[in-house]
Amino acid sequence: MDYASVAMAAAPTTTTTTNVSLRRQRHRKEKLLVLMGATGTGKSRLSIDLAAHFPLEVINSDKMQVYKGLDITTNKISVPDRGGVPHHLLGEVDPARGELTPADFRSLAGKAVSEITGRRKLPVLVGGSNSFIHALLVDRFDSSGPGVFEEGSHSVVSSELRYDCCFLWVDVSVKVLTDYLAKRVDDMLELGMFDELAEFYSPEDEDHDEDSATRTGLRKAIGVPEFDRYFEKFRPGDVEGEDPGRDRVRRGAFEEAVRAIKENTCHLAKRQIGKILRLKGAGWDLRRLDATESFRAAMTSDSGEKCTEIWEKQVLEPSVKIVSRFLDE
């Protein structure tokens, strides 16, 4: 699927008015707020919190969440939790049309940035897929060679950006984040992730190899390869309505899949942090917000009030000040 041509064909034919509220003049770059961080660090929460202070719209930059389907497995923010804030490129791409590449994302997200700015709103890029973030933001993007984050790539991260960016990096200590991510997987299972994956499973698919590098699109999502191995042994249709942990063998296979999901999610978070540090080292002006204490409170306190209080003081309030200064520049 040529997503770039689709975006070009759908592009508006009229020139949008200057966004006075964002202090953007014709000769200046469009302003863009970028919320970065490893998976599970609260980027979506922060975007919704900031919407109470600024007129904004969200552009998703999570490469699994762009696809339709597997809403629980890919941890998409639910419609009620969006609080009426418009979201773009979230569950919009049909996975049957092929994999969305960084070049495709650059085209589609770039169009969204212009449209949001034209509505006198602040575009906010939210997601942990740093290859998509890099593709959208750099002034010159080469899609002909290996990506800047691909193994064996000698590409250099560019510090020349095509937008006037404000970067907020939501960070959580690895130990606390690891514990939280394990709990999040358990919560996702309670919400119905197992049933969602059972419905998604197709024995006719040829890419059941657990190595995500051999998979494409939505089939790369953490949870799919891990449970494919389970469903190969215990077909969903053969055990419909039964408890997946009914007997010892099945329970062992189920627990192994869950363990692998937790482990791979933590590995993903560590890789994402490494990429963020690489962007920072290349000169990207990332403002780090330490959310560790709010996450620790969420894991240890029975009341959400303490967690919310810490989050607002250590993450939200500093973010509001930073964004306010950014918009006044």
UniProtKB/Swiss-Prot annotation:
InterPro entries xref list: Dimethylallyltransferase, P-loop_NTPase
Organism: Humulus lupulus
Primary enzyme class: transferase
Pfam families assigned: IPPT
UniProt cross-references to PANTHER family, sorted A to Z: ADENYLATE ISOPENTENYLTRANSFERASE 4-RELATED, TRNA DIMETHYLALLYLTRANSFERASE
Activity response to pH changes: Optimum pH is 6.0-9.0.
GO cellular component, one term: mitochondrion
Chain positions recorded as ATP binding sites: 37-44, 63, 74, 129-131, 220-222, 313
Protein family according to the UniProt entry: Belongs to the IPP transferase family.
Entry protein name: Adenylate isopentenyltransferase
